[in-house]
UniProtKB/Swiss-Prot annotation:
Region: Zinc ribbon, residue numbers: 105-150
Sorted UniProt keywords: ADP-ribosylation, Glycosyltransferase, Metal-binding, NAD, Nucleotidyltransferase, Nucleus, Repeat, TPR repeat, Transferase, Zinc, Zinc-finger
Compartment(s) of residence: Nucleus
Domain WGR: 322-422
Name recorded for this polypeptide: Protein ADP-ribosyltransferase PARP3
Pfam family, one: PARP_reg
Residues annotated as binding Zn(2+): C110, C113, C127, C137
Gene source species: Arabidopsis thaliana
Length: 814
């Protein structure tokens, strides 16, 4: 066996690295600087020490000094063991644990998982156990539960010089209560201003900031700092940002808010500055330490390194020598793994491949590292002369990484998640769209040789280009360059769906609150982002985040997987008209609607009448129609078929551009789950609206990508329509009976302006006016049907979003 390349010989966790740094310390007595509690005693507002009430703090410091000077490390371990405490921590931590135990009493087990509690940097007690096999425990408190029983003292300590001092604190009734330094409210006294499209809504951050002692201002006058999305600087910023810079106010990223809340204290503003240094590229900063928008820029520009199950990992360079994934007895020796443990802050991936190269031995490639921290990843490429030995080593590594056997997984997908072990990402045999679709340069050549109508060719060019899929995955944080999230097996997608549905039901029925509820959400988030490998996983907290970052993300990944399979590999010779070829595979007829026709005028009128500007921060975006396409698809009921059904309405459907190909190719799919939020409120339904404004919010992606598409579809609501002004408690009945549903919003279209199209299809086109349902969770009316055969896509409306109050000038490239 020959080792060709090794970038890092050992991949160690943070705990392991700390352990190595401590190896030089002498056993037994520890350095005073690391043994003793800090002597500085911060004070509360009333002047009391936060480490204890009154003299208790001083007494505790003297007690700690006595324990440190008189007990050996062996005696310390004996005290901890006899009182049922964990002794696996580093020695300096064991001393602090022992001092706390002897003075304040033995810690009880974690109320969430039964694990062991330890004091974390004198700020709060945290748990070292696991909630489940997916997630480490997230329990933390300043007032830990303690055993209401006398401390057990081993004989060796009873015979020590400080036995009388220790006995004094044995009785639970005589113990003072330990109070730790307060860091609960990091924003006390701060006025913070928000700007731009952050990963969480401004309303979310307003509540979070106020809950943590701060206030939010709509202006920058007198504020502590301005929190922005770094995307704002790329577009030149707004007057608000310019004003802040002119006043010398700190302009920081959203990560400052996130880290300050998580660490319970305000972080240094200068470390999160986004205007004095506009580029992090080349700094080698791990993505989890960057602002989400900065990470997105790097991940978006990174090339996909493995396109699917047969993809040789790009960094091996073996594909340049004709390398192919080794296959034997029906097994492909190419595995990808992910682990996301939000309790420990882990987000890592692993790649294992056996690669055959012409006129060479078998090659084994192994890579493991933190997401976005490529320079520090463990990576090796080894050449094996013995094929059987290489196969055995591959299987051994698989079991080491995943805690399961390779062959049962590869043949039958049998696997059981093990604590602290990776979980396989089940790649499919195909080419992910980020690799197989056409790049910008190739698109120009392909379009020039396309035999389709020029407008249709440009539309197909959008669907077959990498850009819309790259951006969609990037916005969701599901675009890791190492793993092909757009080429997953149906089994893996089904597993994701089952995990999501199981958790949705748990959310609906749970009575948990406080830290137990937080643990439940952390466990799901870790599980979800292990299956849906992300560049920026987050701990989800509520149903709105569940809808945005799980349900909607799943639907997008599912649809992109469909696009990957249809588009395939277009990287070859573009002179063979690949756009026409993919158009034929779609099984549909798409034609541009004449701008002088009645249909075109009807569509434009419907859009303009029911549209309201999309608002991002303090900027509003209007919309203009570029083209209207008529659609006839083999997968969708024809207009003649749909006209045979009752109660037909022409409605708007919002969609990302990345989801369009699937809609045309396969038809609409119902929502993946039922949640009490718009879009999911009526369960597993196909949801539309009579307001173009509602659809436009789904179609709008970002200010620097103003193009989008809205869908107009005919929906048959059936003979019976049920109206709701609040989320229905039971959506299962609606799904089973396939009853048409109308959700009444706070705004409605003026009914006197409605008209009919194609004889008996209602077009609810009218000015948006306030409705009598002022407390509805819906802003606009929503309509839901449960059978895809009740919907028929009629038009795709190509639109352009434009900032209101500005003049748009097209500039030719130099």
């Amino acid at each position: 066996m020959k080792v060709h390349e090794t970038r890092s010989h050992a991949h160690m966790s943070g705990d392991e690295q700390k352990g190595n740094l401590r190896k030089h310390k002498a056993e037994g007595k520890l350095p005073e600087s690391e043994q003793s509690q800090k002597k500085a005693k911060p004070e509360n507002d009333d002047g009391r020490s936060v480490n204890g009430a009154g003299d208790a703090a001083s007494e505790y410091n003297e007690f700690c000094k006595a324990v440190e000077e008189n007990l050996s490390i062996d005696q310390i371990k004996e005290v901890l063991e006899i009182n049922g405490q964990d002794c696996s921590a580093p020695e300096e931590t064991l001393l602090a644990q022992c001092q706390d135990l002897l003075f304040y009493g033995a810690l009880a087990k974690c109320p969430l998982c039964g694990g062991t509690l330890i004091c974390d940097n004198e700020k709060r007690f945290v748990c070292g156990g696991e909630i489940s096999e997916w997630c480490s425990c997230v329990f933390s408190t300043k007032d830990p539960p303690r055993k209401e029983e006398p401390v057990k003292i081993p004989d060796s300590v009873m015979n020590s010089a400080i036995s009388d001092l220790i006995k004094k604190h044995q009785d639970p009734k005589s113990r003072p209560k330990r109070e730790l330094g307060s860091a609960d409210k990091p924003f006390v006294g701060m006025m913070i201003s928000l700007m731009g499209r952050l990963t969480r809504t401004h309303q979310y951050w307003k509540k979070k900031i106020e809950r943590n002692g701060g206030k939010v201002s709509n202006t920058v006058q007198g504020v502590t700092c301005l929190v922005v999305s770094p995307a704002e600087r790329e577009r030149g910023g707004t007057s608000k940002m310019v004003e802040a810079m002119e006043q010398g106010l700190p302009v920081v990223s959203e990560a400052w808010l996130i880290d300050s809340v998580e660490k319970h204290e305000a972080q240094p503003l200068e470390a999160y500055d986004v205007v004095s240094d506009l580029s992090v590229e080349g700094k080698g900063i791990p993505w989890d330490k960057q602002d989400p928008s900065e990470e997105a820029i790097e991940s978006f520009s990174a090339e996909l390194k493995m396109y699917g199950k047969r993809g040789v990992y790009m960094d091996t360079k073996l594909q340049e020598r004709g390398g192919k994934i080794f296959e034997k007895d029906g097994l492909l020796y190419n595995c990808a793994f992910s682990i996301c443990d939000l309790g420990k802050g882990r987000n890592e991936y692993c790649i294992m491949q056996l690669v055959t190269v012409p006129d060479s031995n078998l090659n084994m490639y192994f890579k493991r590292g933190k997401v976005g921290d490529d320079p520090n990843a463990e990576e090796r490429l080894e050449e094996w002369e013995d094929e059987e030995a290489a196969i055995k080593e591959f299987a051994r590594l698989f079991e080491e990484i995943a805690g399961n056997e390779f062959e049962p997984w590869e043949r039958e997908k049998k696997i059981q998640k093990k604590p602290h072990k990776f979980f396989p990402i089940d790649m499919d045999d195909g080419i992910e769209v980020r690799s197989g679709a056409l790049g910008l340069r190739q698109l120009g050549i392909a379009s020039a040789h396309c035999k389709l109508d020029s407008f249709v060719a440009n539309f197909i060019k959008v669907l077959c280009g990498q850009e819309i899929y790259n951006y969609a995955l990037m916005e969701l944080g599901l675009d890791p360059p190492d793993l092909p999230m757009g080429m997953l097996t149906d089994i893996h997608l089904k597993r994701c769906e089952e995990v999501l549905l199981e958790f949705v039901e748990k959310v609906k029925t749970t009575k948990e609150t406080g830290q137990k509820a937080e643990a439940m959400w952390a466990d799901f988030s870790s599980r979800w982002f292990s299956l849906m490998h992300s560049t920026r996983p987050m701990r989800l907290h509520d149903v709105n985040e569940l809808a945005d970052h799980a349900a909607s993300a799943f639907e997008t990944v599912r649809d992109i997987n469909t696009a990957s399979r249809l588009i395939g590999d277009m990287r070859g010779d573009t002179l063979d008209d690949p756009l026409s070829d993919r158009y034929k595979k779609l099984g549909c007829k798409i034609s541009v609607v004449d701008k002088e026709s009645e249909d075109y005028k009807m569509v434009v009128k419907y859009l303009e009448t029911t549209y309201e500007p999309v608002k991002v921060s303090d900027v509003e975006y209007g919309v203009s129609v570029q083209n209207v396409f008529a659609v006839e698809s083999d997968a969708i009921p024809s207009l003649d078929d749909i006209k045979k059904l009752p109660n037909k309405v022409l409605l708007w459907c919002g969609s990302r551009s990345s989801n369009l190909l699937r809609h045309i190719y396969k038809g609409f799919l119902p929502a993946v789950c039922s949640l009490p939020v718009p879009g999911y409120m009526f369960g597993r339904a196909i949801v539309c609206s009579d307001a173009a404004a509602e659809a436009a919010r789904y179609g709008f992606t970002a200010v620097d990508r103003p193009e989008g598409f809205l869908v107009l579809a005919v929906a048959s609501l059936g003979e019976e329509v049920t109206e709701f002004t609040s989320p229905p408690e039971d959506t299962k009945t609606l799904e089973d009976k396939k009853i048409g549903v109308k959700g009444l919003g706070r705004k409605k279209t003026e009914e006197s302006e409605h008209f009919m199209w194609r004889d008996d299809i209602k077009v609810p086109c009218g000015r948006l006016v306030p409705s009598e349902h002022k407390d509805s969770p819906l802003e606009y009316n929503e309509y839901a049907v449960y059978d895809p055969k009740q919907t028929s896509i009629r038009f795709l409306v190509e639109v352009k979003y434009e900032e209101k109050g500005t003049e748009i000038v097209d500039v030719e490239p130099e």
